[in-house]
Amino acid sequence: AAGRVAAHCIVGAYTDRAALAELAALASGLAPDLEKSVGSLVQSDLLLESSGEQDKTYSFRHALVRDVAYESMLREHRRQLHERLVRDVIPDDEKQRVPELVAHHLTEAGLVVEALNYWKQAGYRASRASAHYEAIAHFQRGLTLIRELAEDAERERLELGFQAGLTGPLIASTGYTSEAVKAVVARTSELSKRVDNAPEIFSVLYSRWGFLLTSGSIFESYNAAREFSSLAERQGNKDALYARYRMLGASRMCLGELEAARLDLEQAVSLYRKEEHEGLITAYGVAIRVAARCFMGEVLWLKGFPDSARGNVTLALEEAKSIGHTHSIGMALYFCGLVSFLYRDANAVREYTEEMMNLASRQPLAAWPTLGKAMQGWAQLAEGDLDGGLPLMRQGIDSAKKAGISMFMPFLTTRLAEILLSLDRVDDAESIIADSEALMDRTGERNYEGELRRLKGELSWRQGLFEEAEAQFCAALEVARKQEAKAVELRATISYARFLAARGQPDRGCAMLSSIAAWFEEGKDGHDLVTAEAAIAALKGEARQV
């Protein structure tokens, strides 16, 4: 019976009757009395018997019994049994289905290189299933095992593969700006310089780009995207040649190059082929077309096409859900919320952020819920809950800052400043505006610079600094027009038109505002166009009285 206990503890979780019989035969010769022996172990309360669909399975009642039995075997004998279990017992389909089981037995058998292959398979398999913590554990197990190898070029090549694999689930679970991701990105960047022709080089460069973009090194992220693109062209890598458009488009959007960004992102959407590109989730940690549609939504809103913007992010969410990739779903929910936030649709913001928070309570969603919390706070404010909404919005912004997130922050901080101005908390608003400007100068994220200039104009006007106010309103219009950001230009024109009316020029303000409002073909029921039409009516009335 002791031999059967030992055999069983080697099998571990792989405990159906057939496997136990085969291993028992391997361990101590043919075992015609296996049924009797196992039965005696069950009667002795050492094993627990369970009936499955096709056969019975067995497990130890107490881990201590298993451990004692395992340690009672000679180390070399244990090693041989682990190896023979992989070679002779576990069927091939099971090896593909549960690679971590094979990896464990090969590790215990001392077959490091073979084990690494299966730990890597297990990591990627878990990552594809959005089991991020499990994937992290598998990749880290492999990295621990790699340390047993001699320090040479092959070891560095193997480590690069595992570090690159680890990056995706780390980003999905902790966000691009976490210390863990920062460390892995630094290590993979270092290794990639020493490993020639590494197949992981593109996922390494992509992760570095994502870190730079999210943490607020926008121009550096653009250079990283260009480096990725150039390498893809030199190597003729079709997958990377496709993925580059998502990267270039996102960086250009943040730089305020909206039309160039639109063209890049349009390529990422139109060139997508499911059979070729859906599998890129494994290398890049997100569905590329989903991400492209998300950023396209932001670009289109800025350019003055709010209905098209909402259509793009809605399609992104539908695609992410059809794929079933958690991180892609989280991203799409955030961008659905963001476009609704920019459109000032409080109900939609609340619905999308609540769905995101519910998903985040079950699975990690990186930094998306942190940013979502700030938008959730604004939705409460828009519905009249000042006491609950304002602290929640501040909390979301502060949490994002503490996490090292800079991208998207101008949308949130300028909205907060606008609210504070409306509450006559001028000093608080001035502080937020100054912080927003400093952040924008540091990161290079310029796609909402026009809104910042508009708010500086509103602040100066409130403070009685009329020349400065007019200069800021004009600067806002100049930036918005240069970027072709019609949504921002509309908001700046509303403010400037009101300012002109207050300074005795309502007809001039009315003409400017009527011109920009007439340009829009989408979003007629949106907050900003409704506000513009009301302002035009008021300005016409004032002009008649002059």
Residues covered by each model-derived region:
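Short coil/turn linking the two alpha-helices of tandem helical-hairpin repeats
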Residues: 110, 123, 150, 167-175, ...
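Structural motif corresponding to the intra-repeat A-B loop/turn of tetratricopeptide repeats
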Residues: 109, 129, 173-175, 195, ...
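Helix-coil-helix junctions within alpha-helical repeat/solenoid scaffolds
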Residues: 43, 163, 188-190, 229, ...
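Short secondary-structure boundary elements
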Residues: 1-137, 141-149, 420
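Start-of-helix signal in alpha-solenoid helical-repeat scaffolds, especially tetratricopeptide repeats
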Residues: 79, 83, 96-103, 116, ...
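Internal alpha-solenoid helical repeat scaffolds
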Residues: 140-339
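TPR-repeat structural position
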Residues: 79, 112, 129-132, 178, ...
